[in-house]
Swiss-Prot record:
Superkingdom per UniProt: Bacteria
Keywords in alphabetical order: 4Fe-4S, Cell inner membrane, Cell membrane, Iron, Iron-sulfur, Membrane, Metal-binding, NAD, Quinone, Repeat, Translocase, Ubiquinone
Lineage, opening ranks: Bacteria, Pseudomonadati, Pseudomonadota, Alphaproteobacteria, Hyphomicrobiales
NCBIfam families: NuoI, PRK05888.1-1
Keyword Phosphoprotein: no
Protein name (Swiss-Prot/TrEMBL): NADH-quinone oxidoreductase subunit I 1
Residues annotated for [4Fe-4S] cluster 1 binding in this entry: C51, C54, C57, C100
Amino acid sequence: MIGWLEAMLRVGRKLFVKAETQLYPEEKPKLFPRSRGRIVLTRDPDGQERCVACNLCAAVCPVGCIDLSKAVADDGRWYPEHFRINFARCIFCGFCEEACPTAAIQLTPDFELGEWRRDALVYEKHDLLIAGEGKVRGYRYWSVAGKAIDGKDKGCAENESPPVDLKGLLP
């Protein structure tokens, strides 16, 4: 009988203490600045997509959830013909963001990715591409790399050092 009263007193004391539970849809959780959530593809300041389909993100992905294929535009610029991420397999490690040389792929703090069907977690390029520049502002990859200058050989462009003669370095 005494054990029962002790239990009721313990429950009664906790009855008036503020609950620690957050009511999720009404109260959004506080995320850390470096939290990793939904993956997006960004555009450069000119409005063109930054991705050059180098396949580094797919190569570094530990679970292999990124699939893309390269196409070449009329001006010689590479772009992904299709870009697909399977969020059912993604572990949000951030390796793809670190490996991207153009800052095209970025992880946002958006974590609400719940779906009823598993195939709805496969995002295509049009689902991933956003209108803005994302976290890296003002970066134009194609202004510093990737395009040949007509009439100039390697090392002849402005701010470019001539190529190193590797055979001349041999003993």
